[in-house]
Swiss-Prot record:
Phylogenetic lineage: Eukaryota, Metazoa, Chordata, Craniata, Vertebrata
The species this protein was found in: Homo sapiens (Human)
Source organism superkingdom: Eukaryota
Omega-N-methylarginine: modified positions: R69
Chain's gene name: RPS11
Entry's Gene Ontology cellular component terms: cytoplasm; cytosol; cytosolic ribosome; cytosolic small ribosomal subunit; extracellular exosome; focal adhesion; membrane; nucleolus
Protein name, as recorded: Small ribosomal subunit protein uS17
Record keyword Cytoplasm present: yes
GO process annotations (BP): cytoplasmic translation; ribosomal small subunit biogenesis; translation
Amino acid sequence: MADIQTERAYQKQPTIFQNKKRVLLGETGKEKLPRYYKNIGLGFKTPKEAIEGTYIDKKCPFTGNVSIRGRILSGVVTKMKMQRTIVIRRDYLHYIRKYNRFEKRHKNMSVHLSPCFRDVQIGDIVTVGECRPLSKTVRFNVLKVTKAAGTKKQFQKF
């Protein structure tokens, strides 16, 4: 990632102090700033890009101020047209007692996608975790991405 300072406000992680007196120490070279990251627990590994990357995202579960609590769900990526937000589709079966059969149903969910997950494509299976409301429609954060298999456009139950 080239330059993170593209916004009007200075982009920085709030927990990292950047105003160290380097003149007194005699250091003149550009050194890499320390980076804040955390282990979110629940058996999910922190991505390498979250540890070594330079992106700033306050809504990222690994480098931001968001805690994962509540439900852990999975779904298939259907749309990627928003910035740092994707739409996933969750398929399920609903039982109809009169006909003694099941019908297919689905729900779409808006989910925050951290920049540490770089190569996410439509059709990939993502695992998401519940967090505090991040916007009007977003209440979940991507925790893991599994690449799509060869078959597409079929009903998948999670």
